[in-house]
């Protein structure tokens, strides 16, 4: 199950989980042998990053299986404050080649979620040039953004809604 807490998720207008709901959802999922992956895929600014350690500790304490991050700072904090959670790299990080996938793996990522814009052949090349232990995830559908994943400026320009803050107007 993929879900988000009330902070740091890219779905600003979704009914995300408060800490108590998240803990209950994780317990329910685990009772049914289902893993829970929590998104932390915004790019936190300085005034937001200070809240991230407490959020990560709550996720760790709730038993979340993996956190999905896009930002290197969030990735680093997840290793420190959510040591029981696997770290997955969001499509928002725009991983579009095997060198980048391997770099994230070397830093401790167990899964990379590739940029949505890749062809099947490009995905195959990444798989063939990364360790078998590194899980690869790829979207087969998705946003129609005029950009690479995680680098959208058009939404903000056209509507004043910042896609990199979870408010994409797509």
For every predicted segment, state its role.
Residues 1-95, 99, 113-117, 121-170:
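Active-site pocket-lining/capping segments in soluble small-molecule metabolic enzymes
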Residues 108-109:
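As written
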């Amino acid at each position: 199950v993929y879900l988000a807490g009330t902070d740091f998720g890219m779905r600003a207008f979704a009914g995300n989980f408060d800490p108590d709901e998240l803990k209950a959802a994780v317990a329910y999922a685990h009772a049914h042998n289902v893993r829970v992956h929590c998104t932390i895929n915004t790019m936190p600014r300085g005034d937001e990053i200070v809240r991230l350690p407490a959020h990560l500790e709550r996720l760790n304490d709730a038993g979340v299986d993996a956190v999905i991050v896009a930002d290197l700072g969030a990735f680093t904090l997840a290793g420190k404050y959510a040591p029981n959670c696997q770290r997955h790299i969001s499509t928002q990080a725009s991983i579009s080649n095997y060198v980048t996938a391997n770099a994230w793996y070397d830093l401790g990522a167990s899964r990379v979620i590739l940029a949505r814009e890749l062809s099947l052949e490009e995905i195959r090349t990444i798989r063939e040039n990364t360790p078998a232990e590194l899980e690869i995830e790829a979207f087969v559908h998705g946003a129609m953004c005029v950009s690479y994943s995680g680098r959208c400026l058009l939404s903000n320009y056209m509507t004043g809604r910042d896609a990199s803050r979870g408010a994409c107007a797509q």
